[in-house]
UniProtKB/Swiss-Prot annotation:
<dbReference type="GO" id="GO:0006364">
    <property type="term" value="P:rRNA processing"/>
</dbReference>
<keyword id="KW-0820">tRNA-binding</keyword>
<keyword id="KW-0819">tRNA processing</keyword>
<dbReference type="InterPro" id="IPR036345">
    <property type="entry name" value="ExoRNase_PH_dom2_sf"/>
</dbReference>
<dbReference type="GO" id="GO:0009022">
    <property type="term" value="F:tRNA nucleotidyltransferase activity"/>
</dbReference>
<keyword id="KW-0548">Nucleotidyltransferase</keyword>
<dbReference type="GO" id="GO:0008033">
    <property type="term" value="P:tRNA processing"/>
</dbReference>
<protein>
    <recommendedName>
        <fullName>Ribonuclease PH</fullName>
        <ecNumber>2.7.7.56</ecNumber>
    </recommendedName>
</protein>
<keyword id="KW-0694">RNA-binding</keyword>
<dbReference type="InterPro" id="IPR018336">
    <property type="entry name" value="RNase_PH_CS"/>
</dbReference>
<dbReference type="GO" id="GO:0000049">
    <property type="term" value="F:tRNA binding"/>
</dbReference>
<feature type="binding site">
    <location>
        <begin position="124"/>
        <end position="126"/>
    </location>
    <ligand>
        <name>phosphate</name>
    </ligand>
</feature>
<keyword id="KW-0698">rRNA processing</keyword>
<dbReference type="InterPro" id="IPR050080">
    <property type="entry name" value="RNase_PH"/>
</dbReference>
<dbReference type="GO" id="GO:0000175">
    <property type="term" value="F:3'-5'-RNA exonuclease activity"/>
</dbReference>
<dbReference type="InterPro" id="IPR020568">
    <property type="entry name" value="Ribosomal_Su5_D2-typ_SF"/>
</dbReference>
<dbReference type="InterPro" id="IPR015847">
    <property type="entry name" value="ExoRNase_PH_dom2"/>
</dbReference>
Length: 238
């Protein structure tokens, strides 16, 4: 029995609160159970130096956790004077994932930054960030079309992510913290809405996992992501 009584295939209760803050071009509070992440999209004219003159845009991301997002307080990275390796890895993952959702040539010379701030962490913060940021990105792009900044929407489709893992020998979808901390195998999967893989991050914490277990976990992730994409689209249709 899982802590919240879910089935092995079931994702946590999922909500998207759009237009959560008023200044950002896209702003979404995403909640996967007790994990809550604020995702804001900012649109700016211009692109990084390495893209100037190429007629395409850029999507980047920043990620951070509030000091009391977890059980005990973690000092702000700004107070330490540098970002940690985990933070850098996660924000690069978020950016890579979101770039898979849009046609950068159609975007033109604009940069969109997704700021993902974890308000409360209970497992799956990076996958929640990707999932919520994609909705914020969609809102920002829709606004750019409505304002006449873009003639065509560069969004190719939704991108979503979920964690899967093996806990006490059982393959589970969308791990919460107590499951994640006890997992023998832990994997984060990012997919497009049509089931193509953007990124797969998998680690055996204990015993190595088999090829068959890998396929089981990927199938579990696909099912979870299908559910998540439906929720993304329903939120955007409101």
């Amino acid at each position: 029995m899982r802590p919240t009584g879910r089935s092995a295939q079931q994702v946590r209760p999922l909500t998207f609160t759009r237009h959560y803050t008023k200044h950002a071009e896209g702003s979404v509070l995403v909640e996967f159970g007790d994990t809550k992440v604020l995702c804001n999209a900012t649109v700016e004219e211009g692109v990084p130096r390495f893209l100037k003159g190429q007629g395409q845009g850029w999507v980047t991301a920043e990620y951070g956790m509030l000091p009391r997002a977890t059980h005990s307080r973690n000092a702000r990275e700004a107070a330490k004077g540098k970002q940690g390796g985990r933070t850098l890895e996660i924000q690069r993952l978020i950016a890579r994932s979101l770039r898979a959702a849009i046609d950068l040539k159609v975007l033109g010379e604009y940069t969109i930054t997704l700021d993902c701030d974890v308000l409360q962490a209970d497992g799956g913060t990076r996958t929640a960030s990707i999932t919520g940021a994609c909705v914020a990105l969609a809102d920002a792009l829709n606004q750019m079309v409505a304002n006449g900044k873009l003639k065509k929407n560069p969004m190719k489709g939704m991108v979503a992510a979920v964690s899967v893992g093996i806990v006490k020998g059982e393959a589970l979808c969308d791990l919460e913290y107590v499951e994640d901390s006890a997992a023998e195998t832990d994997m984060n999967v990012v997919m497009t809405e049509d089931g193509r893989m953007v990124e797969v991050q998998g680690t055996a914490e204990g015993e190595p996992f088999s090829h068959e277990e890998l396929l089981t976990l990927l199938a579990l992730a696909r099912g979870g992501i299908d559910t998540i994409v439906q929720a993304q689209k329903a939120a955007l249709a409101d």
